[in-house]
Amino acid sequence: MLDAFSRVVTNADSKAAYVGGADLQALKKFISEGNKRLDSVNSIVSNASCIVSDAVSGMICENPSLISPSGNCYTNRRMAACLRDGEIILRYVSYALLSGDASVLEDRCLNGLKETYSSLGVPANSNARAVSIMKACAVAFVNNTASQKKLSTPQGDCSGLASEVGGYFDKVTAAIS
């Protein structure tokens, strides 16, 4: 897992060069937006249970067969596993947003996820739909447009961070589809 700083140093070291120019400008921007980044992560994690439960509920509303006796969300145990998986994905997205790097998400969450779900018979389209609902909710919290929020969210233009969060969810969708 690399954060924004480690990534810049590693890249410069691999070229046997000093850190400078565009790399320093990118780090300056990362630092200047640090409070927005922290507030964005806080707004997501403070509303994590709502984001995940809304995503799973939305997925089930669109595909009620998931809670029928042969469905993948039938029984409390399977529903709990579905909610747990959503929480794990959201947690790793928040880690990626905090560090400004997707490697923690890719290495510790997405690696082998599609194969695991396939072996369990979990429908990829339902998973992808739940992730897209989580994406919409998380972006709304970062942009301060969510209707239900537990705390104040980042002030100022957070469209760049919202886009970054959306990109992390897109990686999840691509990994499970």
UniProtKB/Swiss-Prot annotation:
Pfam families in the record: Phycobilisome
Entry PTM: Contains three covalently linked phycoerythrobilin chromophores.
CDD domains: PE_beta-like (cd14767)
Record-linked InterPro entries: Globin-like_sf, Phycobilisome_asu/bsu, Phycobilisome_asu/bsu_sf
Name this polypeptide is given: B-phycoerythrin beta chain
Something else known: The light-harvesting system in Cryptophytes contains phycobiliprotein complexes. Unusually they are composed of either phycoerythrin (CPE) or phycocyanin (CPC) but never allophycocyanin (APC), with only one type of biliprotein being present in any one species. Unlike cyanobacteria or red algae these proteins are not arranged into higher-order phycobilisome complexes, and they are found in the thylakoid lumen.
Gene3D superfamilies with a match to the protein in the record: Phycocyanins (1.10.490.20)
Source species of the chain: Rhodomonas sp. (strain CS 24) (Chroomonas sp. (strain CS24))
Example GO BP: photosynthesis
Location of this chain's protein in the cell: Plastid, Chloroplast thylakoid membrane
Gene Ontology CC annotations of this record: chloroplast thylakoid membrane; phycobilisome
